[in-house]
Amino acid sequence: MLEAMAEPSPEDPPPTLKPETQPPEKRRRTIEDFNKFCSFVLAYAGYIPPSKEESDWPASGSSSPLRGESAADSDGWDSAPSDLRTIQTFVKKAKSSKRRAVQSGPTQPGPPRSTFSRLQAPDSATLLEKMKLKDSLFDLDGPKVASPLSPTSLTHTSRPPAALAPVPLSQGDLSQPRKKDRKNRKLGPGGGAGFGVLRRPRPAPGDGEKRSRIKKSKKRKLKKADRGDRLPPPGPPRAPPSDTDSEEEEEEEEEEDDEEEMTVGGGVPAPVLPTPPEAPRPPVTVHSEGAPPTDSEGKDVGSTETSQDGDASSSEGEMRVMDEDIMVESGDDSWDLITCYCRKPFAGRPMIECSLCGTWIHLSCAKIKKTNVPDFFYCQKCKELRPEARRLGGLPKSGEP
């Protein structure tokens, strides 16, 4: 047993020694790989020429055998040369970037930016072309792309004008400004005037604009004439535009007038309201004219009319009551007669005649509904003085004492 235990003892140290010897080997490989990786990245980025890098890095290989002596020495002494090499590479990079900046042009600001701008130079040109295409396709006011303040005109000054000419004269750009012009005209005078001023210097779509303006002005004049025949102009009279005003200002004033007429058109029936109550005056005056004489025929006719009409007569009576003040202005004397004991004039309100004394009393004062008018009516005085009148009911006026 002891021998068996003693046998593996000499075998134990080698596995313990192997992990001790492996870490320095791994470190040496990782540092070399790191150096190779750094050199490859710097050469690939263009900071260091590959020829110089290949000549410089073999010198570092001489330090690799030294690492076999001790791990601590290799870490302490090899770190400084590697740092120096990285610093030298960055210095070379800065010098090369300065040279490239001088060669490329004075517009590019700093050394690091110059290298990136050198790498991105073709991308910037393509971006400018894409921006130009986007402006020509998606901008509402197409010809503004060719304005002197646009970035495309500043960057592409060397290009001939023929290359930029097709952009503002495309069909989509001609149709879109007209739509925008219509929208601005509908919005108000400020937007339309400002947009018209901006669009004046453009020569190409001028003829189309003039034609559209002439057509619009003709349509507006025709509409105005039709409206003038149909409705009188409400409100105070408007002064005609002066001769010094431009065509755009005249069109804006016409649009304002049209909008005002459309807005006032909703309130036009207000002044016409007095006319409906004036229509039923003739049947009402028939009752009032029959008030002074003592004929029972007028009373019977009025009562039968109100009873037969029903709802129509009630609605007319309500309209008469509501428009009492308007109807009082008429010059008919019967409207000013005061026969009811409420001491108020006839004023077009429905009245009923007493079958005994012949006095006319308002239906509202007699507490009689317009839909239920009796054939024989007795006023309050007759009821108080002659209680037998109520019993007799249909006492004729000829039998009155």
Curated annotation (Swiss-Prot):
It comes from the Eukaryota. Residues 231-240, 271-283 have a biased composition (Pro residues). InterPro entries: Znf_FYVE_PHD, Znf_PHD, Znf_PHD-finger, Znf_RING/FYVE/PHD. Residues 1-30, 50-123, 139-320 are annotated as: Disordered. Residues 303-316 have a biased composition (Polar residues). Its main location: nucleus. GO terms for biological process: autophagy; negative regulation of autophagosome assembly; negative regulation of autophagosome maturation; positive regulation of protein ubiquitination. It holds the Pfam family PHD_2. The modification N-acetylmethionine is found at residue 1. GO terms for molecular function: zinc ion binding. Keywords: Acetylation, Autophagy, Cytoplasm, Metal-binding, Nucleus, Phosphoprotein, Ubl conjugation pathway, Zinc, Zinc-finger. The modification Phosphoserine is found at residues 124, 147, 150, 313-315, 398. It is found in: Nucleus; Cytoplasm. The PHD-type zinc-finger domain is required for interaction with LRSAM1 and negative regulation of autophagy. This is PHD finger protein 23. The lineage of its organism: Eukaryota, Metazoa, Chordata, Craniata, Vertebrata.
